[in-house]
Amino acid sequence: MKAATDQELRKLIVLYNNVMEVMEHDAAKSMRDDNRAYGGFVRAAKGKIQELITERLVRTVWDVEMGENPERLSINSKKIKIPILRSYVDSINDENLKKYISSNILKYSYGLSVDKHVFIDNKFVLGIECKAYTENAMLKRILVDFYLLKTKFPKLNCFLFQLESQLGGDYSECNKFPIGSYPTRTIMSYFKNVDLNIVTLLEGERKVDRPINKPQFFKPLKVEHLEVAIGYLQESLSEI
């Protein structure tokens, strides 16, 4: 890994530390000034820092580690229209309903997005869902979203980037090739077209009663875990 890449990773660690250091204070201020729920503020803040870290990692891999032209890469989260399946329409027994849908077929679509859509030369190559943490009930929806996206973009690389893991197994060990957990792998087995790469940044299974925004439960963001994420992303982007 290039020295410049290492420097960028250490900047991300400083950013993470700074955000976590003031999160409790900012949450209390939000409750006082805006009458906002503490839990909602903290969840949103953790989600935002995860999204920011993820986007910075993608750009660091492309711009710094791979030395590619930054203008070739773009990231957004605009909704993508998933069209209705013609085979579904053909299978409808109600002829009136089938006729109605067929005559309005262009109106039938579902707008779908994940947190980060990564494009190279305007080609959608990476989809990344960002979570402060993930449990298996949440994973089901993530897999459904990617399943639908893969019907339109079959070569899409799919990622879940999470600060903490609540999936069980060894996801919380932050290894590159986790074995996973029994329930997680079982759920994933029903979405065979989705090869979901799960990247965890903070060690240790998430505990509801040990929130990392509390100083006594703080978890450090380590450079070696960011390096694992860098490796995943570089491998995928090198295939482009």
UniProtKB/Swiss-Prot annotation:
Domain of life: Bacteria
EC number annotated for this UniProt entry: 3.1.21.4
Keywords linked to the UniProt accession: Endonuclease, Hydrolase, Nuclease, Restriction system
Molecular function GO terms recorded: type II site-specific deoxyribonuclease activity
Top enzyme class: hydrolase
Gene Ontology BP annotations: DNA restriction-modification system
Catalyses which reaction(s): Endonucleolytic cleavage of DNA to give specific double-stranded fragments with terminal 5'-phosphates
Name of the protein in question: Type II restriction enzyme DdeI
Organism: Desulfomicrobium norvegicum (strain DSM 1741 / NCIMB 8310)
Highest classification ranks of the organism: Bacteria, Pseudomonadati, Thermodesulfobacteriota, Desulfovibrionia, Desulfovibrionales
